[in-house]
Every structure is written in C-alpha cells, then in structure tokens.
Amino acid sequence: MASSTSLPAPGSRPKKPLGKMADWFRQTLLKKPKKRPNSPESTSSDASQPTSQDSPLPPSLSSVTSPSLPPTHASDSGSSRWSKDYDVCVCHSEEDLVAAQDLVSYLEGSTASLRCFLQLRDATPGGAIVSELCQALSSSHCRVLLITPGFLQDPWCKYQMLQALTEAPGAEGCTIPLLSGLSRAAYPPELRFMYYVDGRGPDGGFRQVKEAVMRYLQTLS
C-alpha cells in the first residue's frame, strides 16, 4: 500500500520555516552601525564644563580677579581742613629763622603735606606786619610757637604768642609750644596751662609737632 506522505519534487529546494525567516529579518533590521566613541577629553569637557554665565567664580578667585576699588576718602571740598588757607602758622624770633625753616620743610615734606605759613616767606609784600600776622593766624588751623631764648627776649614774639592765644582761646590742641634750648623753669607763664613739645630730642621735637597737628586736623568735621 502506497504511503500517503508526499515527497518533494525532484530538483526543488527545501524552504526555511517561516519562524526562522522572521527572526532573521528582525535581527537584520535591529542591527545599527556602531558610533565612533568620543575621546575622553571631549566627553569630559562637554559634560563637566559649565558655561561662564552659569557658574560664578569662587570667592577666593573673584576677589583676586576683580579690580580693587581705591579706598574712599572724604572729598577735599567737603572737609573743614580746606576752609582755611594753612594748616600751621609758625611763630618764631628773627634769630631762629633757620630753625623755623627746618621745621616748615619737615612738615611740608611729610606724607601729610601740611600747608605752613612762614612770615618772611609767605607774607604779602608791602602789607602791614601786624595785619599780616593776624591774617596768618586767623587763616591757620594750628599755631606752633618756637620758644627759644631769643623768642622770650623779643617783644614782637610775645605779641605773636598772645595774639595766637587770643585767636583761639578755648581751642584745645591748636596752639603747640615747641620749647628749644630752655629749661622748664623758663617756660612762659602764659602757657603753663598747656603741655609743650620738648625740643631736646634727636629730631628737635619735629615729629611730635607733626603728630599734634595731625591729631587736631582729624578733629575737624
């Protein structure tokens, strides 16, 4: 009895099962070309570098890179120091002119650049001596009295001293006596109510005079 199973025709090729064909197409379609990997430097730079607008500098760096502003100072025009023409008026005897010039050079050459009035240098030519002195005293914040043996023997110097006290009778610190070549016993009685600068030091008391002037100028508002 002949078998019912049919054999393939001669010369025909066997066909793949449909299930295997579907799997083969699926795998082929799902395959994608591999991308070229980025270099580690470009990847890290792209991923970790934020924009300059989004990330402010750390405090330590910003304080270094930011331009520093100059310290603020009070306006020259608004300071009471500039309400007068001079910071210091130096009163001295004629024989002490060299010592007075040295003192003025020291004060004007300091970092404070103090403005000094020296009568023989700054008085108006042709002006009355008394008027020039009174004008200089009223136009100065401080008065330095260079008290020496020649100062005590000169009536004109005593007038300068009394006029300086009259200009500012209650202003503490604006009249600065500089005692040079004299003992304390020779200190004028008119000045016994205020301390003096001892000129026997190596700098002749110039530094203390400058500091006293600066202290007074700092009290001006």
From Swiss-Prot:
GO terms for biological process: 3'-UTR-mediated mRNA stabilization; cell surface receptor signaling pathway; cellular response to bacterial lipopeptide; cellular response to lipoteichoic acid; defense response to Gram-positive bacterium; inflammatory response; innate immune response; MyD88-dependent toll-like receptor signaling pathway. Changing residue 125 to H: Abolishes NF-kappa-B activation. One of its GO terms (cellular component) is cytosol. The keyword Transferase does not apply. Pfam families: TIR_2. Changing residue 55 to N: Does not affect NF-kappa-B activation and TNF production. Disulfide bonds join 89-134, 142-174. Phosphorylated by IRAK1 and IRAK4. Also phosphorylated by BTK. Polyubiquitinated. Polyubiquitination follows phosphorylation by BTK and leads to TIRAP degradation. Residues 1-82 are annotated as: Disordered. Keywords: Cell membrane, Cytoplasm, Disulfide bond, Immunity, Inflammatory response, Innate immunity, Membrane, Phosphoprotein, Ubl conjugation. GO terms for molecular function: identical protein binding; molecular adaptor activity; phosphatidylinositol-4,5-bisphosphate binding; protein kinase C binding; protein-macromolecule adaptor activity; signaling adaptor activity; Toll-like receptor 2 binding; Toll-like receptor 4 binding. (Microbial infection) The TIR domain is structurally mimicked by the TIR domain of B.melitensis protein TcpB. Adapter involved in TLR2, TLR4 and RAGE signaling pathways in the innate immune response. Acts via IRAK2 and TRAF-6, leading to the activation of NF-kappa-B, MAPK1, MAPK3 and JNK, and resulting in cytokine secretion and the inflammatory response. Positively regulates the production of TNF-alpha (TNF) and interleukin-6 (IL6). This is Toll/interleukin-1 receptor domain-containing adapter protein. It comes from Homo sapiens (Human).
